[in-house]
C-alpha cells in the first residue's frame, strides 16, 4: 500500500535491534485518515472470506481493526492484556511475548464475544516474530473458531512471524512488507 509506505518513509524512525518506531501515526498518535484507508484496503482484500468478527490485541491493533470492522460491517473484539474488574473468569487466554517491551502478557477474550460459528479475521499493527498472532490463533483454537485471514499493517519479512500463518494455510495480507531496516536508518520495502 503506497500511502502507508510513504508514511513509513516520511515518519518512521529506525531504532537499534530492528525496531521501527511509528508512534506518530500508528501506535501512539493515530492518523485517522490513514487508518480509514487501511480499513478499506483490508475490507477489499478479505471481502470473499465472509468474516463475522475481527480479533486483535490491545492497544495498537485496535485502530486498524476498528476501521476494518467499519469497512466490513462486523464487530471487533480485542484481547485484553491486563485483567480488570469487568473481565469475568469465563475467558479464553494465551501467553504472548512482546519483543519491543521485553515482557510477557496473558491476553484474554471473554467467551461471550466469540463462538464456534464465527469466521474470524485477525488484524494487527506489526508482524515480526508472530507472538501476538500466535496468541490469537491459540485463543481461536480453544474457542474452536475458524480463522479465515490475518491482516497486518506492517510486516518485517526478514523475521519469521509469517511462517506461523503459512504453516496453517491462512490467508495473510500485509499492507507494508519490510525486507530490511538498515544501520543508517533506512527502511527497505519488498
Curated annotation (Swiss-Prot):
Binding site for 5-phospho-alpha-D-ribose 1-diphosphate: 128-132
Organism per entry: Pediococcus pentosaceus (strain ATCC 25745 / CCUG 21536 / LMG 10740 / 183-1w)
Subunit structure: Homodimer.
Catalysed reactions listed for this entry: XMP + diphosphate = xanthine + 5-phospho-alpha-D-ribose 1-diphosphate
Localization per Swiss-Prot or TrEMBL: Cytoplasm
Gene Ontology CC terms, in alphabetical order: cytoplasm
Major site of localization recorded for this protein: cytoplasm
Protein name (database record): Xanthine phosphoribosyltransferase
Residues reported in the UniProt entry to bind xanthine: 20, 27, 156
EC number: 2.4.2.22
Origin: domain of life: Bacteria
Pathway involvement of the protein, from the record: Purine metabolism; XMP biosynthesis via salvage pathway; XMP from xanthine: step 1/1
Family per similarity comment: Belongs to the purine/pyrimidine phosphoribosyltransferase family. Xpt subfamily.
Molecular function per GO: xanthine phosphoribosyltransferase activity
Keywords: Cytoplasm, Glycosyltransferase, Purine salvage, Transferase
Gene name as annotated: xpt
Role description: Converts the preformed base xanthine, a product of nucleic acid breakdown, to xanthosine 5'-monophosphate (XMP), so it can be reused for RNA or DNA synthesis.
GO annotation terms (biological process): purine ribonucleoside salvage; xanthine metabolic process; XMP salvage
Lineage of origin: Bacteria, Bacillati, Bacillota, Bacilli, Lactobacillales
Enzyme class label: transferase
Amino acid at each position: 500500500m503506497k500511502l502507508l509506505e510513504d508514511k513509513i518513509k516520511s515518519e518512521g524512525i529506525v531504532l537499534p535491534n530492528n525496531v521501527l518506531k511509528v508512534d506518530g501515526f500508528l501506535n501512539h498518535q493515530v492518523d485517522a485518515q490513514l487508518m480509514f484507508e487501511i480499513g478499506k484496503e483490508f475490507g477489499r482484500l478479505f471481502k470473499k472470506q465472509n468474516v463475522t468478527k475481527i480479533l486483535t490485541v490491545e492497544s495498537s491493533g485496535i485502530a486498524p481493526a476498528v476501521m476494518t470492522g467499519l469497512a466490513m460491517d462486523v464487530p471487533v473484539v480485542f484481547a485484553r492484556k491486563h485483567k480488570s474488574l469487568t473481565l469475568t473468569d469465563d475467558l479464553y487466554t494465551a501467553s504472548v511475548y512482546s519483543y519491543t517491551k521485553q515482557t510477557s502478557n496473558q491476553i484474554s477474550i471473554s467467551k461471550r464475544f466469540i463462538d464456534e460459528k464465527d469466521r474470524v479475521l485477525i488484524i494487527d499493527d506489526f508482524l515480526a516474530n508472530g507472538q501476538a498472532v500466535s496468541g490469537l490463533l491459540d485463543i481461536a483454537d480453544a474457542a474452536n473458531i475458524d480463522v479465515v485471514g490475518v491482516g497486518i499493517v506492517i510486516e518485517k519479512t526478514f523475521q519469521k512471524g509469517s511462517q506461523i500463518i503459512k504453516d496453517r494455510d491462512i490467508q495473510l495480507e500485509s499492507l507494508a512488507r519490510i525486507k530490511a531496516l538498515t544501520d543508517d536508518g533506512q527502511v527497505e520495502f519488498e
